Regions:
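Conserved catalytic core of nucleotide polymerization and phosphodiester-bond processing enzymes
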Residues: 1-223
Length: 223
C-alpha cells in the first residue's frame, strides 16, 4: 500500500503483544500481570524465569526461545511442536514448558478452567461474551478432542483481541469523519490509515482511540 498522493503518509498503528497481554489480564497471573504493569519486556521476563537467570543475563537466543514459548502456549503447543520450532531435543522443550507453568502457575490453572468450562457449556467466549461453539470438546476421539481443547484455550484470547481491534476500527472511523484522512485496512492487530500531512495531530487521537477500545482487567495496560 502507498499513500494516495504526496499530500498523504501511511500510518501504521498496532497493538504490542496484545494476545499475551490478554492472556495475563484474563488469567490474572500475578507474575505476568506485574511484568506488563511495570513495563518489562515479557519475552525477556519469561526467558529469565524459565532459564532461572537474572533478566540482565538473558541473551538474544534465550529471548527468541521464550518468545516462541510465550506464543506457543496460547495455541497449546506440545513439547514435540516446540522442539521442532526451536530445533532442540524434545526433552529440552518439555522442560521449558514445565518451567513456564511453574513460573506462571495461574496461567496453567486458567487454561485448565477454560477447557473444563467448554466441556460443560459446549462453547468458549471472549471477554465481551461473544461465543464460539465447540461441540467437539467432548469427542471420544482423542485427536479431535485435543484440537477442540486448544480452540477452547485460544478463543478467549484471540477472540478478545479480535473484539478489541473491531471496536478500535469503529472509534478510528468516527474520529476520521470530516477529515481528509481515512482508515484503509486492518491486518490482525494493526490499522493502516492514509493520513493527510496536514492532519498529523490526529496521531495521538488515533492512539487513544485504540488504547481505550477495550480496557483489560487486572490493570494490564494496552501499551
Amino acid at each position: 500500500f502507498v499513500p494516495a498522493s504526496e499530500e498523504y503518509t501511511m500510518l501504521s498503528a498496532d497493538y504490542s503483544q496484545i494476545e499475551l497481554r490478554i492472556m495475563a489480564a484474563l488469567s490474572g497471573d500475578p507474575a505476568m500481570c506485574g511484568a506488563f504493569r511495570e513495563g518489562r519486556d515479557i519475552h525477556t521476563e519469561t526467558a529469565a524465569r524459565v532459564y532461572g537467570i537474572p533478566r540482565d543475563q538473558v541473551d538474544a537466543v534465550m529471548r527468541r526461545a521464550a518468545k516462541t514459548v510465550n506464543f506457543g502456549i496460547i495455541y497449546g503447543i506440545s513439547a514435540f511442536g516446540l522442539s521442532q520450532r526451536l530445533g532442540c531435543p524434545r526433552g529440552e522443550a518439555a522442560t521449558l514448558i514445565e518451567n513456564y507453568f511453574t513460573q506462571f502457575p495461574v496461567v496453567k490453572s486458567f487454561m485448565e478452567d477454560l477447557v473444563h468450562k467448554a466441556e460443560q457449556a459446549g462453547y468458549a467466549e471472549t471477554l465481551l461474551g461473544r461465543r464460539r461453539m465447540i461441540p467437539e470438546i467432548n469427542s471420544a476421539n482423542k485427536t479431535i478432542k485435543s484440537a477442540a481443547e486448544r480452540t477452547a484455550i485460544n478463543t478467549p484470547i484471540q477472540g478478545t483481541a479480535a473484539d478489541m481491534i473491531k471496536i478500535a476500527m469503529i472509534h478510528v472511523d468516527k474520529l476520521l469523519k470530516g477529515t481528509r484522512s481515512r482508515l484503509i485496512l486492518q491486518i490482525h492487530d494493526e490499522l493502516l490509515v492514509d493520513l493527510h500531512r496536514d492532519e498529523l495531530d490526529l496521531i495521538p487521537k488515533i492512539e487513544e482511540a485504540m488504547v481505550s477500545a477495550l480496557p483489560l482487567p487486572n490493570g494490564v495496560p494496552i501499551l
